[in-house]
Amino acid sequence: MSARLSFAALAFAVASCAYVEATTTQYVGVPKFPPTKAAAVQVLPGEPKQRHDRLGEVLLDISVDPAPPVADIEERLREEGAKMGANAVYVIRDAIRPGEGRKLIGIAIRFRQ
């Protein structure tokens, strides 16, 4: 009986886990940069005024119930932006749609010197 209870508890825990899944798209015709450190990538609420180049998009598929902490979402944006060589990622869309869940789109950018 305790094995069944343990299995049921494990199944519940797995089913109730929050998730942040990412898909990235690098833009065509944009120079490729070496990866940066995720900790150095800024997450911005909108497009910055500083001169920059757009490297690509980061699409996050985020669980709604339970929702992950905001820090986990921002960390995933940093990680994916860093893979493209970005200095920052700014959010262009963050929406929850019935039946689709939460979708967030960010643009990975590299500031010009």
Region roles according to the model:
Residues 35-69:
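Post-signal-peptide N-terminal segment of Sec-exported extracytoplasmic proteins
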Residues 1-17:
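Sec-dependent bacterial lipoprotein signal peptides
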Residues 15-33:
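Bacterial Sec signal peptide processing site at the extreme N-terminus
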Residues 49, 67, 96-113:
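Short acidic, glycine/proline-enriched helix-loop-strand junctions
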Residues 39, 54-56, 85-88, 100-107:
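Envelope-exposed proteins and targeting segments
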Residues 2, 85-87, 111-112:
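Short helix C-cap/helix-to-loop transition motifs enriched in small/turn-promoting residues
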Residues 55-93:
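Short, well-ordered alpha-helical segments
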